[in-house]
Amino acid sequence: MILERIVTDNLPDLERRKMRLPLAKLQELVLDIPYLPIDMAMKLKGRQVRLIAEVKKASPSKGIIRPDFDPVDIAGIYARNGASAISVLTEEHHFMGSLDNLKKIRESGVASKLPLLRKDFIHDPYQVYESRLYGADAILLIVAMLSPERLQELLSLSHKLGMKCLVEVHTRSELEIALESNARIIGLNNRDLHTFKIDLTVTERLRPLIPPECIVVSESGIQTRADISRLEELGVDAVLVGEALTASVDIAAKMRELL
């Protein structure tokens, strides 16, 4: 299964990072960060559907999506053209991302008013702390790869550090776990992470089951304005779009088309 392989492939890298920067030292550095995270939940509420634009170089299903990849330049385009938040893929082996990309975007100031979402396969408290250190305002938590107990632990730690969580589900049973954990930003992933197949009806089936106090984000497979209009009718608050933007010759023009 693709999800399991991605997690396994990244375990040695995580252990090396722990060796280079032990948890106790990482925690000290996080405590010294002078600024508070930007509230992603506040940015995703509104009368119109909000856009989380993703900085994405490659994927397991498509390979390299954007050969001339400049994460800071792309984030700047997103910030200038209506994005409400920016998702930054940091997984290295299958998506060609990096934590350094997240850090560069934060330190560049090109998106200083927008929350940065670290999109990765997070399963260890160490990753939550390092997300904060590298400039994330929010993190992705995938229910399919976490026990309910670990999900709750990571949610609580993230909130303690001031970060919001996009809690991602693909099935009704995963949604029930997310809601039981009191997740407030729910991501409905139209992509099955075990097969990487897309099905936009996932959002259609699961959206009615989510209470009104939650923020609902539809993820994956969103290519056109018609897709977004359909999701808007279903009552989602935001959409997360990556490939359709980074694969475009003119990213700004594609954003104008979608919004």
UniProtKB/Swiss-Prot annotation:
Keywords on record: Amino-acid biosynthesis, Aromatic amino acid biosynthesis, Decarboxylase, Lyase, Tryptophan biosynthesis
Keyword Lyase: yes
SUPFAM superfamilies reported in the protein's UniProt record: Ribulose-phoshate binding barrel
Gene Ontology terms describing biological process: L-tryptophan biosynthetic process
EC number: 4.1.1.48
Pfam families: IGPS (PF00218)
GO molecular function, one term: phosphoribosylanthranilate isomerase activity
Enzyme class: lyase
Family: Belongs to the TrpC family.
Protein name as it appears in the record: Indole-3-glycerol phosphate synthase
Gene name of this polypeptide: trpC
